């Protein structure tokens, strides 16, 4: 039984990576519909091109809106696992800007 769960999870992740460009467009469009001033970035192993199918897909969203609002809208748009959504204010986002490669979406 657990073998089937692992296979399902791997196939789901494979599909997310195969459709990465489409998913990133959906993320950007959804976030900008809620907050046109928001900035969206890809970071982590995917932005460094060091990922595999067990990697998550890290997304940084810089906005002054409450994170729950962004998470809710992305969930409705179908953005779920393996996407790891990090929502921060501009001040808190400075941490990411100094420690990792950010690729603007």
Name what the model sees in each region:
Residues 1-41, 47-54, 62-105:
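Catalytic core of pol beta-like nucleotidyltransferases
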């Amino acid at each position: 039984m657990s073998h089937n769960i692992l296979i399902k999870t791997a196939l789901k992740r494979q599909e997310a990576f195969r459709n990465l460009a489409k998913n990133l467009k959906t993320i950007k469009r959804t976030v900008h519909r809620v907050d046109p001033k928001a900035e969206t970035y890809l970071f982590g192993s995917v932005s460094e091109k060091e990922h595999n199918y067990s990697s998550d897909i890290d997304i940084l969203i810089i906005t002054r809106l409450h994170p729950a609002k962004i998470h809710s809208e992305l969930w409705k748009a179908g953005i779920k696992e393996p996407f790891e959504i990090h929502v921060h204010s501009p001040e808190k986002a400075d941490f990411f800007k100094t420690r990792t490669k950010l690729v603007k979406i």
